């Protein structure tokens, strides 16, 4: 199933307690990040003291939802040394944290004994799983959703295992 950004925003707004996101790729080819990634490679960095220069709609959504008491957590399983893309992503993750997300990083070598799903996913209120399907170079292809309780339980357990071992963003240095 494909999904528009509006549909995804509505889905996030419908969450009552928690939304967790597990990311496991070392690179993404997301259209709306291509320009920023190129600028980052040329030395541009976001200024943490100038939110007007980096605030974006996703951060408004996170702030809106977390203000209602919803917990949004993101965990990233990454290879070390990190790829350029992960270094880029790390450089702006302070923006996610500023909006209310909690973010942790887990070096892949510390995840070898964990049973992780084959794709990145969001888990909403512990019930609905949305898998994000990417092609071999990291371009988003589509999403698959399921409310299967066994799949949701597997994803919840996988996320919590990564979260427990992960390093909070503020303490993970690249």
Predicted regions and their residues:
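PLD/PLD-like phosphodiesterase catalytic module centered on the HKD motif
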Residues: 1-50, 54-174
